Amino acid sequence: MMTTTVDQTAIDPITFEVLRNGLDAIADEMAYTLVRSARSTMIKDCMVYSAALCTASGDLIAQAVNFPVMLCSTPDALYIVADKFRDNLAPGDCIILSDPYEGGSHLPDIFMFTP
């Protein structure tokens, strides 16, 4: 019988908070950039958008402080994109997805993913 051990390195609370707040700040900057460059009144005035950082496997690691309900369909959309483009993505690529049958909840949902 084979046993495996998992090396769980503990992280001190201060380092954890510094990293967590840094990731949250990145997500917030993504959201602010979207608002500053948007032409849609739904984004600029109604603030109906979300921004988040996810792992390559689709797990959420940080989200901007805005409309979090939009993040509910993000993992499904990310899985679709990862499945179709996983082997062909390079730094600088941006995949735009607007398909209610492929992860979005309705047609106006637009997802942008970058590796």
Model-derived features with residue positions:
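Glycine/proline-enriched, intrinsically flexible loops and inter-domain linkers
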Residues: 2-91, 96-115
